[in-house]
Amino acid sequence: MADQTFAEAISKVLYPSDDHMQGKMLRLKQFYFLASATMQSMIKRHKAVFDDLNSLPEHVVIQINETHPALAMPELMRILMDEEDFGWDEAYGMVKKIFHYTNHTIMTEAMECWDENMFRLLLPRIYQIICAINEKYCQKLSVYYSKEEEKIAQMAVIGNNEIRMANLCVALCRRINGVSNLHADILKTRIFKGSYQIFPQKYLAITNGITHRRWLALANQGLYHLVREYVKGDILKDYHLFEQILPYKDDKEFCKKYEKVKRNNKIRFAKYIKEKQGIEVNPESIFDVHCKRLHEYKRQLLKCLHIIYIYQKIKKDPTCITTPITFIFAAKAAPGYARAKEIIRLIHSIQEMVNKDPDMDGKIQVVFVENYCVSVAEILIPAADISEQISTAGMEASGTGNMKFMMNGALTIGTMDGANIEIAERVGQENIFIFGDSAEGNYNKKMYHTYNPGIIFENHPGIRDVCNCLIEGNLLRYGNRKYSEIYQNLLFGEYGEADPYYILADFPSYIETYEKVYRLYVDHKDEWIKKAVVNTAKSGYFSSDRTIEQYNEKIWNLKPVK
């Protein structure tokens, strides 16, 4: 009974908070449990069909997404050696042919490292195998970097009493890909630079994709039927066909129907939020949407500061907003991510401050969508007018929300980051709104310590007033709290650089660019609709069908089943 209870605990809470040792241990057990079960099942199925495990690399390809499933590699070696009587070199060679690694983020916390002592205690046999892999890998590195011991130590799988899962993937996987062109370049030139210099043929870019079957045909049936009306062929089977609607951006009848679809989707969301949260929103307002995982690099905080900026602007000049704006947030924070939760509290305080102020009636409104999930996204994304893709340039690997929004006719305001760059290349710079510094510019600021947010604070009165609102003024009446830690982090830093996500650095550019977005919607609605049509027409490239085709052409080499 005790063994059964212990075993069941592994699968009771998926991915628990890992800000304490018990959470880390449970998470490692879960990773191993899932990896081992998958490898055992794969071996069993292969033997049932082919009988001979020597042919495994001819029939099996395993794509590791992030480092979470990386334990599958040493686990497969364990099965082959300990249960199937393969030698070390045979098992090692098979794993190197079978596994491929997709990196999805450059954030440090995603580059998983396990405490070596904990790992040895929980998974002793897997630890032995990883030690042998590390020794073999470091021997190979020493051929190329014979006089650079520090570099080899950084690239090693084991170092500083840690087991580095990203380095394990780099050591064993046949191909390594980023999920956008920029992301792949960053992997090659920064994150895995040492490996890339030795094995450049291993590295490539395959941009992420989304399925039009869910995010158009299911989530936005009005737009799906409109596109089908004007396109010859099945757009769900051939993503290239979306280009056929491009000429209709100049067709008044088509644009009128397109605009009506958007309005109906906004009415649908307004009904949803009224039913679920009791909030009334104006479907005639501009729906400005920031919905994604809550993380500092995704810069929900920048949007918060911008709303405070507009709030203060309206207080001084009520005529500055003629068409109302509904600012919509939807996000969840990781259980142990304190700063992310603090930003959610800030959003709620801003929501209360804005929505309870009679001066904001008919001007701006703030909505935080509760319990955000795919089902809610299917209602929210088709309703959006503005898509906020404002991550710190160089930190978003790709993003897929940006693709879902542009496909559904929202115009993007964003940085040159991740797949935003490729969206801009396809729709044209005139059909997207880009602001802020580049990935290279941000990298240089960090490397050469040239950034001082205090200068922006002192020289930009509007931004200074916004920052001060975090610790004084109207905001403090709502939520009964100061946001001193956020203020401190923006201007002075905490045990490191100030404003590490360059929020104040990009704030002036964001204010200027957003004004252009607003004026286009208010003063030139016909042009807005044309740009939205272009975005939908160019969304075909971002189909997951194209992504899968490229994985197959460049990595898997699978034959289609007819």
Residues of each region from the PLM?
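A conserved ligand/cofactor-binding region detector
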Residues: M1-K562
